[in-house]
Amino acid sequence: MDAKQGLYASAYEHDACGVGMVVNIHGGKSHELVDNALRVLENMQHRGAETRDKTGDGAGIMVQIPHEFILLQGIPVPEKGRYGTGVVFLPKEEKLQNKILNIMIEEIERDGLELMHLRNVPVNEDVPGVAAREVMPDIRQIFVAPMPSLSTASEGEETVSLETKLYKVRKRIERRILPLGIDSFYICSLSSKNIVYKGMLTSGQLRRFYQDLTNPYFHIRTGACAQPLLHQYIPEMETGATLPPALP
């Protein structure tokens, strides 16, 4: 969005989201916590806005990486904490998508990591409003792990090192793709600890859009959700909603 357009002025954009968190204080995981976190989000509907065609101004949820759920999808990931994952928005055009993936692979491998798997995130494309559907990107989940020959650190050291590398990789990818002007590209998250599901949705649409979130084998112990404050900024499908810092 331009710095100034009509009555809109970017100088007045700021975060004032409705946020919530659900935690199992005993550390246990369950799908019930996913359901409860989504209920918290849905109860913040008054914090957001939507158009006549039911296009929302953004909503999202951040949870721990559901390691067991990922294994059940047949994805051969390493041990918990020894790989990173994240949801990525990609353009639907195959040529642009391949260009972005090549850049991602280059930057991932620069840090001794490898893109080990690319998963199509199951979504219900009938859920978002008309305007959101018109700009909907391809939604993928990437899995990144250290190259086997370089994975020699202890589990604790590797987790800290991997998280730092994933942050650097994400920033380098974003810097390289930004000048290309590809609006439909966005990395929702890239971490060895947490994963973010978000988009240009209402708080009530998130659950129905991302089918992972209603899978009974998707278990978490902590969930944080966000619903932007009405009229605080102009929404875009790529960015969706803002979210709190990473969960502990």
Each language-model region and where it sits:
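N-terminal segments that mediate ammonia production and transfer
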Residues: M1-L247
